Amino acid sequence: GKEKDALKTYEKVLTLDGDNLQANIFLGSYFYLQAEKEKKKLDDDFKKITSPTRMQYARYRNGLSDVLTNSYSKAKTYLQRVLQVFPSMEAGNTLERIKKIEAEIR
């Protein structure tokens, strides 16, 4: 439950101060980790299928596309804000990983 409270609190902070470093770092990291978890589940579930049909493959690709659109894109937005305010190597590395994932999925 506290995770959702923290999420709401940081989102409120950003409505008052869009460049707040802590809030952008937290939200960027949160959405990135959520995306990684969702992607791993999709990958694991798909790997369990020995010979996937076209429909199963299409469902898998659509799932990846949803994760990209919903979670990775949100993470990217917050992490880009971090870099505008503070030269964070970690945020930069995470953005690079997101770019690679975008290239794989598209």
Positions of PLM-derived features:
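Short coil/turn linking the two alpha-helices of tandem helical-hairpin repeats
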Residues: 1, 28, 33-43, 99, ...
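Canonical tetratricopeptide repeat
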Residues: 26, 94-97
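Structural signature of tandem alpha-helical TPR/SEL1-like repeats
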Residues: 1-9, 71-77
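Short coil/linker segments at helix-helix boundaries
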Residues: 33-78
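Canonical positions in the second alpha-helix
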Residues: 12-13, 82
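Residue-level recognition of tetratricopeptide repeat
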Residues: 20, 88-90
